[in-house]
Regions:
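Active-site beta-strand/loop microenvironment that shapes enzyme catalytic pockets
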Residues: 76-125
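Flexible, glycine/charged-enriched surface loops at secondary-structure junctions
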Residues: 51-52, 125-132, 160, 195-197
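Short glycine-/aliphatic-rich beta-strand segments at the starts of folded cytosolic domains
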Residues: 127-144, 172
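Short amphipathic alpha-helix segments
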Residues: 139-158
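Terminal, non-globular segments
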Residues: 172-181
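Short amphipathic alpha-helices in soluble, non-transmembrane regions
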Residues: 148-154, 181-190
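Conserved short beta-strand edge segments in small beta-sheet-based binding/regulatory domains
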Residues: 159-163, 190-206
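C-terminal regulatory domains involved in ligand/effector binding and gene-expression control
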Residues: 1-75, 197-206
């Protein structure tokens, strides 16, 4: 599987026109079950809203879904989905809640409102790249701890909090395939005594 871009957690964007409020809530979702669960969560929290429009994109099966939820066809879910498509992001869902202000907006006004609210939620989101990574671990003497940690950080790895016992255990993540130069540096630092264990590759934001 290739690297891909998505968002971390959730984000919100709002737009108001003629007293109608459009609240776009965006969330990471890597399955249809998670996307639907987020939709139901937003619906439950906004039971008095006139509409809860949604759109989502999933890597799994290249699925894309949307709903206008009672708005005129192609004025709500379609423009929201198009914003997600143009972003290049996947594994995410957006639910746009509309609180009606009493004034009809027309086709153009609705498209603009749902597009803008979704775009603002994307602007507020933290975008991450999901890559194939490995988690590695090495135990060193206290005398080598700081130098080993500096080597790991200089390699661009994500270093977790060390564990201190009679020695120091360091654990970190880095993209799969980038670890050989660092492992060689650690062997040189420890004069060949470093025993590094590595996990199977897995996909995670990096």
């Amino acid at each position: 599987m290739e690297d891909y871009r998505t968002i971390r957690g959730t984000a919100t964007g709002e737009y108001e026109e003629k007293k109608s409020r459009f609240i776009a809530q965006l969330s990471f979702a890597d399955s249809e079950e998670k996307a639907v669960a987020f939709l139901e969560q937003v619906r439950a929290a906004n039971r008095t809203a006139r509409h809860n429009v949604y759109a989502y994109r999933l890597r799994e099966g290249n699925r894309e879904r949307y709903s206008d939820d009672g708005e005129p066809a192609k004025t709500a879910g379609t423009p929201a989905l198009e914003v997600l498509q143009h972003s290049g992001l996947t594994d995410l869902v957006v639910v746009i809640t509309r609180y009606f202000g009493g004034v009809l907006l027309g086709t153009g006004g609705l498209v603009r409102a749902y597009t803008t609210a979704t775009a603002r939620a994307l602007e507020a989101a933290e975008v991450v790249t999901v890559r194939s990574v490995v988690e590695l671990e090495v135990t060193v003497d206290y005398s080598l701890y700081e130098r080993a940690a500096l080597l790991i950080q200089a390699a661009g790895a994500k270093l977790a909090d060390p564990q201190f016992t009679d020695r120091v255990t360091l654990r970190w993540q880095m993209p799969e395939g980038t670890e050989p130069p660092l492992l060689e540096q650690l062997r040189e630092l420890t004069r060949g005594s470093a025993q590094v264990s590595a996990s199977q590759p897995f996909y995670a934001p990096f």
